Amino acid sequence: MATNYIFVTGGVVSSLGKGIAAASLASILEARGLDVTIMKLDPYINVDPGTMSPTQHGEVFVTQDGAETDLDLGHYERFIRTKMTKANNFTSGKIYSEVLRKERRGDYLGATIQVIPHITNEIKARVIEGGKGHDVAIVEVGGTVGDIESLPFLEALRQLAVDVGREKTLFMHLTLVPYIPTAGEVKTKPTQHSVKELLSIGIQPDVLICRSDRMIPANERAKIALFCNVPERAVISLKDVDSIYRIPALLKSQGLDDFVCDRFRLTCKEADLSEWEQVLYQQANPTGEVTIGMVGKYVELPDAYKSVNEALKHAGLKNRLTVNVKYIDSQDVETKGVEVLQGVDAILVPGGFGYRGVEGKIRTAQYARENKIPYLGICLGMQIALIEYARNVAGLTQANSSEFDKHCPQPVVGLITEWQDESGNVETRSDESDLGGTMRLGAQQCHLIEGTKAREVYGTETIVERHRHRYEVNNTLLPQIEAAGLKVSGLSADRKLVEIIEVPNHPWFIAAQFHPEFTSTPRDGHPLFEGFVKAAKEHQGKNA
């Protein structure tokens, strides 16, 4: 069957939740037995978000094949079973880079390179390639209609609708329908103007998703349908909800999936959303709560740790617990002391880059170790735990990472210069390598040592987890640290790189070089986070 395309755009304001809406629709279509994928087209000029500040852009989500992508791809994977790849996210920067590379190579035979047709053709080619082999490909365009940066993408999608046929494409537009308290009613004019903006570039939306803080009355939906030239059944009300996992049922109740299937003439079963009903039941019926102290350097923007936050919630569902996250700036630990860590049931130190706040994280790891508080370290959080143990237990008092001190006399963590990827290829890097796209990225196999807490938590000998880092444990100094009691519980497939460490005489102290949060989902959870949240509850019980 040829691929059907749903193009998702946003209007009026940004941050309306296009990614969540797209993922929710995808989950309903998947529940109807369709093979669905989702793509995100980002208009910014960066080649990828890998070198962007987390406090500006939010987290960088890493796919199985090692793409550094927009955090929306994390939402996609949490809502549907399809795994994202490099084909599921591309930016203006990536498109322009490829077109310029082809021009230098002579592919265009001396033609004058222009936005139309060269840039738009490259966008279309990537969308078609990303949708191959799927029944439905949902394509989300970042930004807001009217932004100059989005124009090449919108023009490419307009052309693509003509190329593949309007019967195989559907334009879904998210808009804001604000409620004005003084008038006591919702206002549809912003939506009308947003659709007018789309029409000016040749796109007639087929479905309107109207975001508001309440359900939009039938008479207002009829008004929107009339003025925006869409069927009344295609005007969908999407109100604010207390859980994003309610949205699939909310969209289904208004017949959005039926409209899509009718449009594409797809014959498929009714959607079974029982898995999502189970998620919502677990969420609504907790038997207790725990507080996790997350000690990081980007805590002013929780989206910088989006997948970690979601993984903690998923672990809460599996343990029937509400998980509260207390964000603690690691610099506050440096200036105010470990008192800021009091009152938490467990401590999590997530990934990060750069020296700022590192000493606060080291003091945090020491506090968790000495006070028997459950600790989960992720990426930098593992390196921090290693440095702390080396300094305070193994006698390597000048231990540090060469990331923070290039002339450190005891570099227990150093730049990784060579490793083997999942395909068996050897990757090499040096201090002179570019920052962008040069880390150890993507899914890697990890061997778990028998008799360790990590092996017990996962319940298997071999796991596959995703990486995003350029520094690793220095094997030269490792024997001295192990002799002091630290346990290596996970190794890379070739047994050369340390992937997991743990403190044996501790209720729950595990730190991993990889990012387990990227593979956690609300339906399946993740064993490492589930074990961590369970340990937090047990610690809470001991201190009650």
UniProtKB/Swiss-Prot annotation:
Domain Glutamine amidotransferase type-1, first and last residues per copy: 291-542
GO CC entries: cytosol
Amidoligase domain: annotated segments: 1-266
Residues holding L-glutamine: 352, 380-383, 403, 470
Binding site for Mg(2+): 72, 140
Record function comment: Catalyzes the ATP-dependent amination of UTP to CTP with either L-glutamine or ammonia as the source of nitrogen. Regulates intracellular CTP levels through interactions with the four ribonucleotide triphosphates.
Protein name (Swiss-Prot/TrEMBL): CTP synthase
